[in-house]
């Protein structure tokens, strides 16, 4: 059997399995805990008095909407991204937010599907702490399980306890809430004993975290001077140059 025919048959089997498993899918994910967590954060912003909000990863890549639309009535809203583009107010690296903004500039900082693309996410947590006001909040939505994307700048996946590894007393935070959502299953394509029952274990495609700044991060115990350019000559891909997959 030729490789081309085998590939076509494999695709047929996968499409058939996808249809058979369709009955396990929820009709909509709007009430999923992952989405409810952002609704909770959104309400925190909307009831605050004249909040200053920073969105990390504001460039219009696929959502085709302005993040400002999520927070009607918020006038002090800044969108930052590593590349210039639509809805981007400031071009800056999340690993170097302290160079782009003054200390204690924002009441709220949030990012959606960004932290998996940060080479040094612990450094980003330190930078967020620096530009947040005391008592300010950060919201992070990212993935415990997801297909690789925006290659080669796709580095990390996060589980429930990852929240505390990034946002803790040393980095100057306390975790207010964390939840995983968007349930999924994985089907192994190898017959290894350790993997053949992978489909029986539930995993999640989304994790949402809310953390509060309770202090400045511990500068005596924490220091990270490297930036991505120190260890790679690649850049986060633009749509025109993004590799397939």
Name each model feature, range by range.
Residues 28, 44, 88, 112-115, ...:
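Short N-terminal micro-motifs specific to bacterial/archaeal maturation
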Residues 119-245:
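S-adenosyl-L-methionine-dependent methyltransferase catalytic module, highlighting the catalytic core
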Residues 49-149, 159, 164, 211:
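Conserved SAM-binding loop
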Residues 35-37, 91-92, 191-192:
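Short gly/ser/thr-rich secondary-structure transition/capping motifs
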Residues 14-28, 53-59, 147-160, 235-236:
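Short N-terminal helix-initiation segments at or just after the protein's N-terminus
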Residues 3-47:
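Class I SAM-dependent methyltransferase Rossmann-like catalytic core
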Residues 31-35, 90, 156:
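A conditional alpha-helix N-cap/helix-loop micro-motif detector
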């Amino acid at each position: 059997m030729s490789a081309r025919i085998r590939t076509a048959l494999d695709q047929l089997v996968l499409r058939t399995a996808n249809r058979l498993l369709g009955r396990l899918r929820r009709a909509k994910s709007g009430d999923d805990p992952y989405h409810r967590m952002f609704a909770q954060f959104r309400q925190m912003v909307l009831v605050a008095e004249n909040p200053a909000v920073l969105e990390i990863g504001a460039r219009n890549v696929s959502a085709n909407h302005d993040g400002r639309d999520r927070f009607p009535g918020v006038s002090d809203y800044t969108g930052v991204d590593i590349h210039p583009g639509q809805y981007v107010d400031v071009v800056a690296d999340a690993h170097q937010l302290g160079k782009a903004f003054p200390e204690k500039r924002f009441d709220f900082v949030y990012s959606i599907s960004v932290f998996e693309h940060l080479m040094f996410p612990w450094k980003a947590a330190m930078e967020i702490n620096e530009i947040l006001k005391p008592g300010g909040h950060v919201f992070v939505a990212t993935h415990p399980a997801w297909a690789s994307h925006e290659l080669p700048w796709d580095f990390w996946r996060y589980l429930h306890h990852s929240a505390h590894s990034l946002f803790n007393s040393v980095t100057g935070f306390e975790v207010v809430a964390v939840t995983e959502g968007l349930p999924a299953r994985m089907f192994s394509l190898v017959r290894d004993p350790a993997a053949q029952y992978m489909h029986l274990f539930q995993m999640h495609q989304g994790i949402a975290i809310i953390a509060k700044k309770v202090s400045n991060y511990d500068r005596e115990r924490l220091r990270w001077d490297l930036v991505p350019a120190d260890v790679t000559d690649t850049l986060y891909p633009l749509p025109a140059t993004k590799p397939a997959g």
